[in-house]
Amino acid sequence: MAAATADDEGSAATILKQAIAGDRSLVEAAEAISQQTLLRLACEVRQVGDRQPRFTATSIARVDVAPGCRLRFVLDGSPEDAYVTSEDYFKRCCGQSSYRGFAVAVLTANEDHVHSLAVPPLVLLHRFSLFNPRDLLDFELACLLMYLENCPRSHATPSTFAKVLAWLGVAGRRTSPFERVRCLFLRSCHWVLNTLMFMVYVKPFDDEFVLPHWYMARYLLANNPPPVLSALFCATPTSSSFRLPGPPPRSDCVAYNPAGIMGSCWASEEVRAPLVYWWLSETPKRQTSSLFYQFC
């Protein structure tokens, strides 16, 4: 087998090839590939009866870490200094009959193409899962991921990054390796946080957690690039074989922040329509916890 280059030796495909060739143990390969997996497109889901659902990625306008490493939020539409504690927001959500939890999509790092995904609509349908947090920390992680994905440039400051990293450190120390879903959310937050830092020209805390296509995009899309370069990071027409199995539903029920740096793929109809189609389908919604085998 040809040796992997420095640029691709950490990719999931390369790791799998090494395992097949016997250059890595299966356990090591599985662990390495799992590090390339993250959750994206986090959004809250609300629905009253059989009415049109509402998918909201903008519920949290700002995140802050208060003394004692306690998370607090400014909710969308509230004054900038009107903070609510994460505990209060958790109770508020759980008390709403319309609240369904969070929708999230599973991707690998190489599938995130900045303004698009390397996952066609028909496949993306099967990447979504429903997350119903029962613990405050799990709820906080989902909220933080959703906020980081929609964080505008004006909020992306070194002080915010430092506070978020400190909070993630505390959350990580409270998390057992056997709490696989929580570990996945933690890893996803680190991927998005470090990539966001890179995109606003702040040195990331960990360069290994900068999404590869975003790394290229910052350099290639600067200074009015030619269309051929811009097209590398934008959605292209999907083959009819990989389109949704039925008419695409209306996607105006998906709320996202157009100014959110890490959520630019939300603008693509090929991302929003599969989310709505998945939710409206009659098939049971897969729970995020079912992504992992339980050994007990």
UniProtKB/Swiss-Prot annotation:
Q: Report whether Acyltransferase shows up as a keyword of the record.
A: no
Note the InterPro entries from the entry.
Answer: Herpes_UL7 (IPR002600)
Q: Which GO cellular component does the record give, naming just one?
A: host cell Golgi apparatus
Which keywords fit this entry according to its UniProt record? Host cytoplasm, Host Golgi apparatus, Virion, Virion tegument
Compartments, as annotated in UniProt = Virion; Virion tegument; Host cytoplasm; Host Golgi apparatus
Any signal peptide, and if so, which residues? none
Looking at the Swiss-Prot or TrEMBL record, what is one Pfam family this protein matches?
A: Herpes_UL7
What does this protein's UniProt record list under function? Plays a critical role in cytoplasmic virus egress. Participates in the final step of tegumentation and envelope acquisition within the host cytoplasm.
Q: Describe, as the record does, how this protein assembles with itself and its partners.
A: Interacts with UL51; this interaction allows incorporation of UL7 within the virion.
Say which family it is in. Answer: Belongs to the herpesviridae cytoplasmic envelopment protein 1 family.
What is the name of the protein in this document? Answer: Cytoplasmic envelopment protein 1
Q: Which organism is it from?
A: Human herpesvirus 1 (strain 17) (HHV-1)
The taxonomic lineage of its organism, from the top, reads:
Viruses, Duplodnaviria, Heunggongvirae, Peploviricota, Herviviricetes
Q: Which gene encodes it?
A: UL7
